[in-house]
């Protein structure tokens, strides 16, 4: 999986440990690691930088507001990214499926179980939630680092797999307990929203709320009303745009905090995402800005007074 070249390992180690680089240095480092000179910067697939940028922005950013747009870029790199994810995630995916599904199954049991079984279902829900959170903390961080190293050495551009990582956003579900403890508004303020984008902010809020209700099932499911609220939030929060933004939020929020103290690769991963986002956001702004004629409004001269 890892390159045998000492120079490549040395360069990769320097980039990962040097977390104080400017955005320009980060972008240059990313292109160098991908085997592309800063002058050429021609992405894989035969596309020019401009064509690839437009394609990337239309397939990653636009579906956040309109999930119905086809992901052509994702389809082109499906085989390679899927093979990477299979290899990098094989060590913990099999158990995480169990830890993810069991709490959801036990959520429905209070509706059909007799009162004498309610304490048992709550205990099992709490147990599976704790196991799931433990699996994520000690499994997903290593998977991301392994995935990043694989992409960097193989010369794969990071934005090509962001969509695939978003599809695996269920891995981040139980980490929301920390987000909720820090406050719901902190989550929403990470994404400045325009007036037209308020439904997206509502989806993010619903997703975080339903996750908090899911994790704290033994505490909150004391009445049928709370059970119904939880199921409604759980259903509303799983729209594609909420899942994608939610995964992006968690990755940006926690790659630079406690987990980064254990694995500096997380912060490198966060810096890569920020660098690409800055690069393509600036490009789109320059592309869409049009010079509009400035209308000079001259006030009429006052009439001479006699």
UniProtKB/Swiss-Prot annotation:
Does the record carry Transmembrane as a key word? yes
Membrane topology per the record? Multi-pass membrane protein
Any stretches that span the bilayer, and where are they?
92-112, 120-140, 161-181
Q: Which UniProt keywords apply?
A: Host cell membrane, Host cytoplasm, Host membrane, Membrane, Transmembrane, Transmembrane helix
Q: Does the keyword Lipid biosynthesis apply?
A: no
Q: Specify the signal sequence span.
A: none
Which cellular component terms (GO) are annotated to the entry?
host cell cytoplasm; host cell plasma membrane; membrane
What's the superkingdom here?
Viruses
Where located? Host cytoplasm; Host cell membrane
Assembly, per entry: Interacts with host RACK1.
Protein name stated in the entry: ORF-B protein
């Amino acid at each position: 999986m890892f390159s045998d070249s000492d120079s490549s390992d040395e360069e990769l180690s320097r980039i990962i440990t040097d977390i104080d680089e400017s955005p320009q240095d980060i972008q240059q480092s990313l292109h160098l690691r991908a085997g592309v000179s800063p002058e050429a910067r021609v992405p894989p697939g035969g596309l020019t930088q401009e064509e690839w940028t437009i394609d990337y922005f239309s397939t990653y950013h636009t579906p956040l507001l309109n999930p119905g747009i086809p992901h052509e870029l994702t389809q082109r790199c499906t085989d390679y990214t899927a093979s990477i994810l299979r290899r990098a995630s094989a060590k913990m995916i099999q158990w995480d499926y169990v830890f993810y599904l069991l709490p959801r199954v036990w959520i429905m049991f209070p509706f059909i179980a007799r009162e004498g079984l309610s304490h048992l279902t709550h205990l099992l829900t709490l147990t599976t939630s704790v196991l799931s959170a433990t699996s994520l903390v000690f499994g997903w961080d290593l998977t991301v680092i392994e995935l990043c190293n694989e992409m960097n050495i193989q010369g794969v551009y990071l934005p090509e797999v962001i969509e695939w990582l978003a599809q695996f956003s269920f891995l981040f579900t139980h980490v929301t307990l920390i987000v909720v403890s820090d406050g719901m508004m902190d989550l929403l303020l990470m994404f400045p929203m325009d007036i037209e984008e308020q439904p997206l902010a509502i989806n993010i809020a619903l997703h975080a709320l339903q996750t908090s209700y899911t994790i704290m099932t033994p505490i909150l499911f004391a009445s049928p009303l709370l059970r119904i609220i939880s199921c409604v939030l759980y259903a509303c929060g799983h729209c594609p745009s909420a899942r994608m933004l939610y995964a992006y939020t968690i990755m940006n929020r926690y790659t630079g905090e406690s987990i980064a103290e254990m694995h500096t690769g997380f912060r490198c991963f966060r810096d890569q995402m920020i660098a690409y986002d800055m690069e393509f956001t600036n490009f789109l702004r320059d592309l869409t800005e049009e010079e509009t004629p400035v209308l000079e409004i001259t006030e009429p001269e006052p009439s001479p007074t006699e």
